[in-house]
Amino acid sequence: MRIECLYEDEMMFVLNKPSGLLVHRGWDNAETVLVDYARALTPGGTAHPIQRLDRGASGPVLFAKSAGMARELSEWAQAGYCRKDYLALVRGECPERLDVDHPIRRRLDGPRVEARTLVRCIAIAHTEPRHASLVCARPLTGRLHQIRRHMKHANHPLIGDGRYGRGDLNRPFRERYGLARLALHACSWRVERPDSHAVVGGLVPLPEDLCEPLRRMGFDLDEDRLPHDLQRYLDPWEWPSDASA
């Protein structure tokens, strides 16, 4: 498997994770994880993931090149200077704007903690058996499965989500449109460097396993495999004062 490196400097680098690959090894002791690819790129094999990304999701993951840089970048991320925006396909006709401010549990048996996600609807497709909406989501907090859980709470669960979605809807989208994965992709990333405050980042095109099903549903994507005028949905959200990693 070839993993694309989206950015690299002396402090950090960003890898483009495909759907189906874990960021790091967990209880299931996966044979290969993204950290393995990351360590192969660095002298001495040291790479520290600063962000997580669900196994079924795709898109950029930030790594630090040393333990010291990892501590610095983690603190910087918690202060709100690392941002990702996501494209998601959700059930039903989503409102033009959603502000989901709903506490969620860190663990099944733990207390609820603050969680907030901003959502903007890009387009609606008249798919069968239910209409579907392509949305842009920006999590202002970094809780586990936050976008997936918040969209379920809003009654617009993600298509292809085996945990928080509905199998009776996921199945037709797989059979009719070829969508065989979680419909969640981090399409934009931005990091303000803690040393110089220079901003690095960029857009990340949809992978083919998500791009082609969306086109079959009738969504209009440009030659860069992103929705037309995507930047229009990203710009108005510039760095909310209460944003965190």
What are these regions (language model features)?
Residues 126-131, 194-198:
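Short, solvent-exposed loop/turn segments that connect beta-strands within catalytic domains
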Residues 30-34, 38, 67, 129-191, ...:
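Pseudouridine synthase
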Residues 1-129, 172, 203-245:
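RNA pseudouridine synthases
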Residues 90-92, 121-123, 137-139, 160, ...:
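Short, structured patches in soluble enzyme cores that scaffold and shape functional sites
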Residues 84, 133, 182, 198-200:
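Glycine-rich GHKL/ HATPase_c ATP-binding element in histidine kinases
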Residues 106-108, 141, 191-199:
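Short acidic, glycine-rich loop/turn motifs
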